[in-house]
Amino acid sequence: MARLNFAALIVIMITAGCVSDVPQMASDGKPVPKPYFLSQVEPAIIQFRMLDGVNALRQSRDADVVNLNASLTAAAATHARDMSVQDRPWHFGSDASSPIDRLVRVGYSGQLVGEVISETYETELETLAAWMTDEGARRIILDAKADELGLAWHQEADGKIWWAMVLGASRTPQVRITE
């Protein structure tokens, strides 16, 4: 009996080593993405990765850097969760709120520069790269008026991530008069 158990153990060990790591393919012929679970990463790390990425892109275009803003992040968090509830990536809340409405609700005293959103399984930097390929999103991210940023997300159990990034301008534009 011991020989049989030992033989079974050997067979199991050998076949376990034969498991192929061939990626599962989607209907479009591309590998099915492996979910990136944000719960395994500290939220501040994700926010600072995105902030660093945004600022590197802005500096490469001679735009000033932006800083994280808690009010903008609160507005982004509300919208990321709401997009998930609606199962729809768009700029209006389930209560018909606009990005401006959400900034008013969180008490942001600056001006909205823009909001960029995404429904994806991608990391924060992959999402930023995708946003940079979209003319409208790129224009918001690089807008020289922006000096503050809020970033938030909501992740579903299957790994789908709803990203929302809001850029704002806290400073009053300077008017220069020359003679």
Feature-to-residue mapping (PLM):
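Short, surface-exposed glycine/acidic/tryptophan-bearing loops
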Residues: 21, 26-28, 73-122
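Sec-dependent bacterial lipoprotein signal peptides
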Residues: 1-16
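Bacterial Sec signal peptide processing site at the extreme N-terminus
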Residues: 12-36
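Well-structured core secondary-structure elements of compact alpha/beta domains
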Residues: 31-35, 40, 44, 48, ...
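A well-ordered secondary-structure block
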Residues: 98-173, 177
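Intrinsically disordered, low-complexity segments enriched in small/polar and acidic residues
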Residues: 26, 39, 175-176
